[in-house]
Swiss-Prot record:
PROSITE patterns recorded: FUMARATE_LYASES
Protein name in the entry: Argininosuccinate lyase
Gene3D superfamilies reported for this sequence: Fumarase/aspartase (C-terminal domain) (1.10.40.30), Fumarase/aspartase (Central domain) (1.20.200.10), Fumarase/aspartase (N-terminal domain) (1.10.275.10)
Pathway stated in the Swiss-Prot or TrEMBL entry: Amino-acid biosynthesis; L-arginine biosynthesis; L-arginine from L-ornithine and carbamoyl phosphate: step 3/3
Keyword Chaperone: no
Taxonomic source organism: Sorangium cellulosum (strain So ce56)
Keyword Amino-acid biosynthesis: yes
Length: 430
């Protein structure tokens, strides 16, 4: 059992401890690699200002690297008795190298210790989310290129509206994901400032090498004001979840479309068989569970965001409430990462029924084209609109391919500007 870092030797109620620790030790298992990495940087920083000798530094770094290897191998497991990863790390160091282990927390609080570990974790998660979203966008871009001229009906209010194309539909998701990636990258830049060295939120009477420690951990800079760092906890997490939500909102719209287009009454799209499930009683069923759960996953992220936003309505300084932002942040990121990992493979396996989509482009879908044609001939548009509306039933079948080719304004079905979208995605490549 670890000695809790705040324990002064008095009796502590066991039920209260369980209530305040909650599942923090389990969440800290996921942060342990980052906590160990930040502790190594902190130890080297302490040695640079003379708090630790070279021998103490080397012994501590050596043992921390051993702990890191054990953690990576799955051999370093936290328990409820540890309370959190911070106590477990210090206890392990004290057990292995004695008094030098007791010096590791000099100039540091659990407040900035958890902040830096969390920021390192969040930075990696945002990097993966951006990469996954870009992979999904590239799969959709490939689809848009392959099916650029494949007609399908375009819908508004879930009613047939105008001729569209699979390429145009797919390109809308490419641009939506590109926007979301911009938000994720901007959020990543916000996270990329090192809070370590702020202690409990008011600095410490040591000349800590905050810049050197930040550099060793790969941060772009230092979060300057320790109180601002402490009060950013939860606010930064809300921004992270908002960025994840934007990726998920685009994925949810795609999932909704796939769900509708795959239903038997439309059957425009066939999901890859490996991405469907069955019924326990109806032998014929191929259920699109994956897209249904993709829709719901967006709500999970949105719920996590609302949870964090509610928790952070606090005055300045650290408050234990902030511990409870860790769970929803991880839960929301887990959902976003799981969904974004799956997206490219799902898109790559889609099959389209061109004949069914073509048949669904009925004569009334060409009403707007006809009104515009009359306007070009000199009829005021509002008069043309009313004339066509009065003659809807008599509209002849149109040429969907010609309709698409005629819409040549930038980004329209006849001018998808896919190379522009590709260049935008290339700028996100790491």
């Amino acid at each position: 059992m670890s000695v809790r870092l705040w324990d002064k030797g008095g009796a502590t109620d066991a039920q209260m401890l369980r209530y305040t620790s909650r599942d923090d030790w389990q969440l800290d298992q996921r942060l342990l690699a980052y906590d160990l990495r930040a502790t190594i940087a902190h130890v080297r920083g302490l040695a640079r200002i003379g708090v630790l000798s070279e021998a103490e530094r080397d012994a501590l770094v050596r043992e921390l690297e051993v702990l890191s290897a054990q953690n990576e191998a799955g051999e370093l497991r936290l328990t409820e008795d540890d309370e959190d990863g911070h106590s477990a790390i210090e206890a392990a160091l004290v057990a292995r190298i004695g008094d030098a282990g007791k010096k590791v927390h000099t100039g540091r609080s659990r407040n900035d210790q958890v902040l830096v570990a969390t920021r390192l974790y969040e930075r990696d998660a945002l990097d993966e989310l951006a990469e996954n979203a870009a992979a999904g966008a590239r799969a959709l871009l490939d689809l848009a290129r392959r099916e650029a001229e494949t007609p399908m009906p375009g819908y508004t209010h879930l009613q047939r509206a105008v001729p569209s194309s699979v390429g145009y539909w797919a390109a809308s998701f490419v641009e939506g994901l590109a926007d979301a990636i911009d938000v994720v990258r901007a959020t990543r830049a916000l996270v990329d400032r090192c809070p370590l060295g702020g202690a409990a939120g008011f600095g410490v009477n040591l000349p800590l090498d905050r810049v050197g420690v930040a550099r060793e951990l790969g941060f772009a800079g230092v979060a300057l004001n320790p109180l601002a760092s402490q009060t950013s906890r939860g606010i930064i997490e809300a921004q992270i979840l908002a960025a994840a939500w934007q990726v998920m909102a685009v994925s949810r719209r795609l999932a909704w479309d796939l769900s509708l287009f795959a239903m038997s009454e439309l059957a425009f799209i066939r999901l890859p068989e490996a991405f469907t499930t069955g019924s326990s009683i109806m032998p014929q069923k191929r259920n699109p569970d994956v897209v249904e759960l993709m829709r719901a996953a967006c709500s999970v992220v949105q719920g996590a965001l609302a949870e964090v936003q509610s928790i952070v309505a606090l005055p300045s300084g650290y408050h234990r409430d902030l511990q409870l932002t860790k769970g929803p942040t991880m839960r929301g990121l887990d959902e976003a990462l799981a969904t974004s990992r799956l997206l490219p493979r799902l898109v790559e396996g889609l099959a389209f029924d061109r004949e069914r989509m073509a048949r669904a482009i009925t004569p009334e879908c060409f009403a707007t084209d006809r009104a515009v044609e009359l306007a070009v001939e000199g009829v005021p548009f509002r008069e043309a609109y009313r004339k066509v509306a009065a003659e809807i039933a008599a509209l002849p079948a149109g040429d969907a391919a010609a309709s698409l080719r005629a819409r040549v304004s930038l980004g329209a079905p006849g001018n998808l500007a896919l190379d522009d979208l590709a260049r935008r995605l290339d700028r996100h490549a790491r």
